């Protein structure tokens, strides 16, 4: 009997610690790992800030003001909430895809965890929770930068942080679900092919109204567009009932991603 099999035999005689307790152990494991890899973690803070400085102020100097909901705002104020949503997406999606795939296929981290009272459900939720935490930290730092650059147009802008957490939750759930289908590193080329158009065409840099009517419907199916619409409404101080379907859509995709993740992880990890 191997050491892993012996550990599983012992595990069978130990009471599970619960899904929430187990998922917190998964998050704790990632925190421990990134104590040594903190430069890799910190570099993720800079990308959205560079976009904000380069596009928000660079191109913004050429564009000037833009009209949104009857308000005239600077281009930097317009684009900043969208870049914050993108920061939440990127922070969550890359850890929940590349990181999860590596731990599933090569490091066998989750198999080792299952030799303890941690369950498959805990592993799935913990992987998502860690990705959400990372995306949320990126968003929080970005929000501070927005405040320092005086790009917070309304006191409601502070509510962009919980909206960013929801965005991270959505993309972390979808990312972990997608990662369970990945067979090799080459498959991530397809994922990047999806993420780049999402970033460029989800009304990140211009209003959705520039698209023809049929294309607007397609863009509205993008989860990043829903996140941007939600966060831009808050950032510009223009709350409306259109935020309700945005939240509902993101929650629905989060639930779908969690369900697929749980099913796939159960299939791959259950001994």
Specify the residue positions occupied by each region the protein language model found.
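Hydrophobic transmembrane alpha-helices and immediately adjacent juxtamembrane helices
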Residues: 1-158, 162-271
């Amino acid at each position: 009997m191997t050491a892993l099999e012996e550990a599983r035999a012992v595990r069978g005689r130990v009471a599970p610690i619960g899904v929430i307790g187990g998922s917190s152990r998964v998050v704790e494991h990632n925190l421990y790992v990134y104590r040594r890899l903190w430069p890799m973690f910190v570099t993720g803070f800079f990308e959205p800030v560079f976009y904000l400085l380069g596009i928000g102020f660079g191109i913004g100097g050429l564009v000037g003001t833009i009209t949104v909901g009857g308000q005239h705002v600077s281009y930097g104020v317009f684009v900043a909430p969208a870049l914050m949503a993108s920061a939440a997406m990127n922070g969550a999606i890359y850890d929940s895809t590349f990181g999860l795939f590596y731990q599933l296929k090569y490091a066998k981290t989750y198999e080792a965890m299952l030799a303890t009272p941690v369950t498959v459900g805990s592993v799935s939720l913990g992987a998502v929770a860690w990705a959400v935490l990372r995306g949320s930290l990126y968003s929080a730092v970005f929000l501070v930068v927005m405040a320092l650059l005086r790009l917070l147009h309304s006191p409601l802008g502070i509510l962009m942080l919980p909206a960013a957490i929801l965005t991270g939750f959505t993309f972390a759930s979808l990312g972990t679900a997608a990662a369970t289908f990945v067979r090799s590193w080459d498959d991530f080329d397809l994922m990047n092919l999806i993420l780049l158009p999402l970033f460029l065409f989800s009304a990140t840099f211009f209003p959705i109204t520039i698209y023809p009517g049929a294309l607007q419907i397609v863009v509205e199916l993008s989860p990043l567009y829903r996140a941007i619409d939600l966060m831009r409404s808050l950032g510009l101080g223009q709350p409306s009932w259109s935020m309700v379907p945005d939240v509902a859509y993101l929650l629905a995709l989060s639930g779908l991603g969690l369900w697929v993740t749980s099913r796939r992880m159960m299939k791959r990890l259950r001994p």
